[in-house]
Amino acid sequence: MLDQRKIRENPTLIEKGLARRGLKVNLAPLTEASERLKGLEQHRNSLQAKGNLIGKEVGQKIKSGISPNSEEVVSLRSKGNELKREINVLEEEEKALAKSIRKRILNYPNIPYSECPDGKDENDNLQIRNWGNPLKGEGYKEHWEIAEELGLLDTEKSVRIAKSRFVTLFNHGARLERSLINFMLDIHTSKGYSEVLPPVLVNTASLEGSGQLPKFAEESFKCSEDDLWLTPTAEVPLTSLHRNEVIPFEKLPIKYVAYSPCFRREAGSYGRDTRGLIRLHQFNKVELYWFVEPKKSKEAHQIITADAEAILQKLELPYRVVELCSGDLGFSASCTYDLEVWLPGANSYREISSCSNCDDFQARRSFIRTKKGNQTQLVHTLNASGLAIGRTMAAILENGQQSDGTVKLPKALVPYFGENQLTPQ
């Protein structure tokens, strides 16, 4: 969430930051409401100070021997009670106005860092580096063809069970999924991440805190009879692990890794990636999440990105790192690196991980602070996919495909899978 004080004190700067995302916003009404709220708070504080003085004066008079029923004391108490009524009215007005302001601010995305390249969309993203040697040429099959030939998955049965954009994995497909999850968790925990297995149902406050709501309500599955939603990413429950908390400074940084099923309606992707494992309503993902002190978040961003890259390197999958331009940033991010894995069958790079620094945006929405000495401040949060399991499987199938119809598995995965190749089932 954007800082209300910064909006009030320098709305033009915030408007320019949002304009870099392609949003034309007039913050004048919000600024006026914020100034009014500040005025109400000051007026209430003034009345409370007067009330405290009256209470003190009443106590002194009674202590000096004046009767509590005297006209003088009764008059003072009457004034005090009147002030309390005024204060109660002001408090209700403040609450209503503060709620209205928060509701408006929740709709605004994070401001891009000054270092973030300007641009409108993915076409303006900046390639930072690449790794590995992409397989290029004719004759490479797409992952869904390979998976069907090997008997790894069945989409028709999934439609019967649920609907389109779901997949059921069988035999080597199910084992490969499980192997990848365990492999990724082991690599990340060996680097100091604490493993978490969070709920897949989360409440509205958790989704608001991470920045998923209200923006992405139509993209999420909701349980209509409860205040619960199927989580679109483990980033949501991981953020809320410390919602409304003060984290002791000496405990920072906190690094979590979590495997979680993820659920998305994909409302805006009609006709895209209708086959295979790239775009599903339900998919598995391993998520990395950091809570850090503000001055170290940019350094942490490089580390969390490298940790996600390490998985691709160990799996021998060619990829590139792309810095997102201001117009392509996710809602909560101030800076993002996408890792895009090479798929020779599709003859293209596809996103497999998004590594974002959200600075204090999520922490302000979730009220997550740290305290060092007498100073309390918001933490910074970072997240990265480490990695999306289905897309990783797709990349392994396409990059490991052999002329005899088998798929060669990366050496690092063999101890987890138990065999060095996938064969027809």
From Swiss-Prot:
GO terms for cellular component: cytoplasm. SUPFAM superfamilies: Class II aaRS and biotin synthetases, tRNA-binding arm. Pathway: Aminoacyl-tRNA biosynthesis; selenocysteinyl-tRNA(Sec) biosynthesis; L-seryl-tRNA(Sec) from L-serine and tRNA(Sec): step 1/1. It comes from the Bacteria. ATP binds at R264, R265, E266, E351, I352, S353, S354. One of its GO terms (molecular function) is ATP binding. One of its GO terms (biological process) is seryl-tRNA aminoacylation. It is found in: Cytoplasm. Keywords: Aminoacyl-tRNA synthetase, ATP-binding, Cytoplasm, Ligase, Nucleotide-binding, Protein biosynthesis. Gene3D superfamilies: Bira Bifunctional Protein, Domain 2 (3.30.930.10), Serine-tRNA synthetase, tRNA binding domain (1.10.287.40). Transmembrane segments: none annotated. L-serine binds at T233, A234, E235, E287, S385. It is an enzyme of class 6 (ligase). It catalyses: tRNA(Ser) + L-serine + ATP = L-seryl-tRNA(Ser) + AMP + diphosphate + H(+); tRNA(Sec) + L-serine + ATP = L-seryl-tRNA(Sec) + AMP + diphosphate + H(+). Its EC number is 6.1.1.11. It holds the Pfam family tRNA-synt_2b. Belongs to the class-II aminoacyl-tRNA synthetase family. Type-1 seryl-tRNA synthetase subfamily. PANTHER family: SERINE--TRNA LIGASE, SERYL-TRNA SYNTHETASE. Homodimer. The tRNA molecule binds across the dimer. Catalyzes the attachment of serine to tRNA(Ser). Is also able to aminoacylate tRNA(Sec) with serine, to form the misacylated tRNA L-seryl-tRNA(Sec), which will be further converted into selenocysteinyl-tRNA(Sec). Consists of two distinct domains, a catalytic core and a N-terminal extension that is involved in tRNA binding. This is Serine--tRNA ligase. The lineage of its organism: Bacteria, Bacillati, Cyanobacteriota, Cyanophyceae, Synechococcales. The gene is serS.
